[in-house]
Each structure stands twice: as structure tokens, then as C-alpha cells.
Amino acid sequence: MEKLEGYSEKPKSRQQYFVYPLLFQEYIYAFAHDYGLNGSEPVEIFGCNNKKFSSLLVKRLIIRMYQQNFWINSVNHPNQDRLLDHSNYFYSDFYSQILSEGFAIVVEIPFSLGELFCPEEKQIPKFQNLQSIHSIFPFLEDKFLHLHYLSHIEIPYPIHLEILVQLLEYRIQDVPSLHLLRFFLNYYSNWNSLITSMKSIFLLKKENKRLFRFLYNSYVSEYEFFLLFLRKQSSCLRLTSSGTFLERIHFSRKMEHLGVMYPGFFRKTIWFFMDPLMHYVRYQGKAILASKGTLLLKKKWKSYLVNFSQYFFSFWIQPQRICLNQLTNSCFDFLGYLSSVPINTLLVRNQMLENSFLIDTRMKKFDTTVPAIPLIGSLSKAQFCTGSGHPISKPVWTDLSDSDILDRFGRICRNLFHYHSGSSKKRTLYRLKYILRLSCARTLARKHKSTVRTFMQRLGSVFLEEFFTEEEQVFSLMFTKTTHFSFHGSHSERIWYLDIIRINDLVNPLILN
């Protein structure tokens, strides 16, 4: 435990002290209102078209924030429209939101500087298109075929928002900025409860996305920081366990002797003393730990996670939230795909002179499929089909032009195929394509007050070309015109596109739920 505390003290040498004065710079709030730093998503704040911030206004806002009556008034009168009440100009939620967005940008600066001045030997080598979501799947294809056990972890939210402030003290030692952060968090927790409910966290997530993302990423980075420490300690344990024996050669000879007496004993016992490499992948508030070790090793890691979360983050992870599964017998939902590693049996008949024999070959394969029912449910919520998958028209779009309707339906279809291009089986995708194509035809037929058959005959191939996906164009280049190839077959070629940096809108609600 002393080593762990010393390990957590190391980053304090890179702490930044002068963050608070940046809150009085006007360009900070121009970033908050516009596109932010590094081209991030714009902050959507209502009613800020004709408003301008100055350093004097920011100073007055901060002074008012330190008066408790402002926050108590906000809690006792939550339904009061302070945005339109010009007498309560400084009390408005609008300006507190602007200030919190500016604060979120300011506190991001020390972390950006820490990445710039990182030693060269510790820098991660830059890899093109590493930000792509699809770049994770080739890694899983390469590694998961050689692993045995898989653990699913739901990263919990902090019980108290004060924990987030304490975690930032490792990186920022600017006391006024930390006090200001406490005022923001106490505002969202309503000053009432000692234990912050999930409602307060979701309120912060909804009203101030940038500040919530920064706090959550800081929290998760500390979580992974200590997880890395445990991983390094497990590697040292492997070397220590080997060094406890006086002579490794005699130990190996002894194990070989036991292996002769008890077939299979040598390999299993050696793995008991080794701590294999642990693979870690985080996504959407969840994490995956995969290893080649034994079930005993996975239980040891489970105990590690429960204990260090209770000690450093002051919350109790329920052991049942960490699921231990054998990789070959489990199927896990990962970024809109149902992934699994099944074992395929292949019988090979060999003929040697007059003797013939069968060889039973078992091969692992990383399989990714598209879940049909959840995606049909997403299309149903978007009013493209019924709950059972029957296509219907979309009356909201009947006021648009024909080209706009075709473009919208075709773009949705292409985006679905583009995101799920790594699926092993395309049958579900072609079912979704059929739903969108027929829904588009019904919408156009409803607009022109005609039947679907008549409208399809009038458009012909122009209507079909709108739903010709990018993946089908790639496959059309792979086969000559003389070769008969059906795009509606069950081909299993997978394509991972490295330009996808966000989850498809129809897939994202499925993951969040």
C-alpha cells in the first residue's frame, strides 16, 4: 500500500499553479461560446447571440457566486425564469452556465500542457487514424484469439462529487479554482445531500456537457492510472516468483519429472506461477479485461479492483458487477456489435499410401454480428417501421422535395452500412436496407398520392442507386463484370473503416440504454 501511495505522489511535480487568472480573459468565453479548443463540438447555449462577456462581468459573477444567497435562491425557486428576469441579471442560470463552460476550458489547459511536455520515452507513438472507433476491432481480432477469460466491468460514477475535486488536486494546486469548482458542483447537488444522487450527475451532464466530460475523463484517468500500477506490480510478481527458487534449472527438471508421471501437469503448474499480459479496453462507461491466465488469476484481479476502488475512490464496487466469463463460451455487446470467439471444428481427411485418417482441427475466430432486434427498435423509434419491422411512411418528411427525401433515406442507409461494415454476416444489414428503401418509397408515394408500385416503376434504377452503399462499391471493384456476384448474398468479408470517430446515431441510444 505504501508503494501505491508513493506511485500516486509522482504526478504532483507537474502541477500547475496559475489557472485562476485565466478566468478573467475574454477570449476564454469566446472559445466556450464558439467551437472550443482543438475544434471540439460547439457549446449550445440558449440566448447568447447578443450577449458579450468582459473581465469586469466575470469578476462580478464570481463575487456573486461566493454569496450563498445566490445558490440558495436557485434551489428554493427552481421554476423561476431568471433568464428573462433582467433584475436578476447576475443570478441567471445562463451566465452561470457560460462561466462554467469557461472554467471547463481553463482547467483543461494544465492537462494539455502535461501532454506537450511529456518525456519522449513516455510518449505514445503517433499512429494515423488511431482515433477511429473501428481501429479497436483489428486489435481485438489480433489479441482475443489467444485469450481465455473475459471480464466485464461497469465503471461506477463517484458517490460524492467532492471526490472529483480531490482527484483534481493531484494535477491542479490552484486553490481558488478548486473552490470555484466546488461551488459549481454544490449547485448541481442542491446543497442538501451528503451523498450525491445520480440525478445530480445527470443534471450536470445535461446542462454542462464540457465540464461533465472533463470531470468524468479526469475521474476515469485516475481510475486507469491506479489500474496501470496494479498491472506493473503483477509483472513484478512474476519475476519475483521465479527468483524465489535457488536454481531455476533444477526446478524445471523437477517439473519435467512430474510431467512424465502426470501428463499435462507440467504446463498447468507453470501457468500457475506466471502472470500473463492483461488487455484492457474501455468504452461507453464500461471496460473489458481479457487475459490468457487461469480463473484463479481473474478472481485475483477482481479482488484487486474491488479493494483499491474502496480505498482510493471511497465507493464499493459490488462483486457481481464484475462478470467473469470464458471467452469461447460468451458473447459480449461491444459498440453496436455482438462479438464472440467461437471454436470452429474442421475435419480434414489425409491419405498416406493405403492408410487414411481424419484430423480434427479446431480454430478460433473473432466473430462480429449486427443485432437485428435492437436496430429495428431504433428504426421503430425513428418512425421508419413498426415494432415488428414492417416499413411505414414518414409523414414528417412529406413536405420536403423528392431529392431531399431520397438523400436523407440514402444517407441513413449508407451510414448504417458504413458503421457496421465489419459484420461477419450481412443479412441483418440488408434487412435494414429493405426497411429503409420501402419506407422511402411509401413516403414518396404518400407525398404524390400514388401507389408504391407506380412510383417505383417511374423512378426505376435512380431510386436504387441512392441506396447503393460504399461497401458494395468496394466489392464491385474486386470482381469483374463477367463474374456473377450478388450483393445480397451472405459473404463474410469485413471492412474496418478508419475514418469513423463517433458512433452512429441509431446505434448510440442502443448502447446508452
UniProtKB/Swiss-Prot annotation:
Record's function text: Usually encoded in the trnK tRNA gene intron. Probably assists in splicing its own and other chloroplast group II introns.
Entry-linked InterPro entries: Domain_X (IPR024937), Maturase_MatK (IPR002866), Maturase_MatK_N (IPR024942)
Keywords for the protein's UniProt record, in alphabetical order: Chloroplast, mRNA processing, Plastid, RNA-binding, tRNA processing
The UniProt record lists the keyword Plastid: yes
GO cellular component, one term: chloroplast
Domain of life: Eukaryota
Similarity-based family: Belongs to the intron maturase 2 family. MatK subfamily.
UniProt record, GO biological process: mRNA processing; RNA splicing; tRNA processing
Subcellular location: Plastid, Chloroplast
Gene Ontology molecular function: RNA binding
Name used for this protein in its record: Maturase K
